Amino acid sequence: MVRIAINGFGRIGRLVLRIALSRKNIEVVAINDPFITVDYAAYMFKYDSTHGRFDGEVSHDGKSLIIDGKKVLVFQERDPATLPWGAEKIDIAIDSTGIFKELDSAQKHIDAGAKKVVITAPSSTAPMFVVGVNEDKYAGQTIVSNASCTTNCLAPLAKIINNAFGIEEGLMTTVHSITATQKTVDGPSHKDWRGGRTASGNIIPSSTGAAKAVGKVLPELQGKLTGMAFRVPTVDVSVVDLTVKLAKPATYEEIKAVVKKASENELKGVMGYTEDAVVSSDFLGDTHSSIFDAAAGIQLSPQFVKLVSWYDNEFGYSTRVVDLVELVAKN
């Protein structure tokens, strides 16, 4: 049984807890969030505007959450280094704050007594692993990153296409649901002026490092992909539009067949496939990293094609976080 703690009880932290509770080999020992009291943590875990009410009993005793009779300690420390991870025998600390995402800052969990750390954000210093893409390269590193939700959607698709046909170059656009960093009304956003505009009433162009990050988990695609984002007024589920120049000619039917085969074999559970006339809400709660929309893609020529893949940027990503935790625990 691997003992885990969750630092940061936001959108990802709460969903990681939901998913981890369903895994028999994981025990969630503690959560930490300096901005959430234990009674409020119970309320936020029990009710979710996007994913619905938690299917179980949730209460608290003033110090711990009590979920279906199981106690989960709640701390309110700003500095992870002060957390009692050693005393609580924490094997893996999951950092979902979005703050402690580099090796030096995530090291605070190790200093506190945790054996390993999984970061739920892209990192420029910690090695990044995308389940289904490069998890076989994990060699026992102490601190790892699960990359971003968009990289988790894009990388499996890019791997399939590159292995089958070769990618010479490509551009990605993610049409991305609202996240917590955006504004309910126009407000200050000094680094990204557009990002400070009302989330619910605008399509907002934004930057993303998700496509470039694919080169970190698939070195053969280094320098071949870049991309951007449009933030749109939906609460969850996003979609990747990948336009690529192929090295080898292919028909769209051949591309569909290759993706479908991968989704049923080596990437089962990570890559999904659909030919239905779907829309974004059809993927709420979907646990795949990426669901290929066979009916949405288009082809201009045998070597130039646009591919479309959906992802629940909250639930699918959080599922992969827990998968990565299990992988790290085995090594």
Swiss-Prot record:
The keyword Oxidoreductase belongs to this UniProt entry's keyword annotation: yes
Single GO cellular component term: external encapsulating structure
Known catalytic reactions: D-glyceraldehyde 3-phosphate + phosphate + NAD(+) = (2R)-3-phospho-glyceroyl phosphate + NADH + H(+)
GO BP annotation list: glucose metabolic process; glycolytic process
SMART domains reported for this sequence: Gp_dh_N
Annotated Gene3D superfamilies: Dihydrodipicolinate Reductase, domain 2, NAD(P)-binding Rossmann-like Domain
Site (Activates thiol group during catalysis): H176
Keywords: Cytoplasm, Glycolysis, NAD, Oxidoreductase
GO-annotated molecular function: glyceraldehyde-3-phosphate dehydrogenase (NAD+) (phosphorylating) activity; NAD binding; NADP binding
One Pfam family recorded for the sequence: Gp_dh_N
Subunit structure: Homotetramer.
Family: Belongs to the glyceraldehyde-3-phosphate dehydrogenase family.
Name of the featured protein: Glyceraldehyde-3-phosphate dehydrogenase 2
Organism (species): Kluyveromyces marxianus
Organism lineage string: Eukaryota, Fungi, Dikarya, Ascomycota, Saccharomycotina
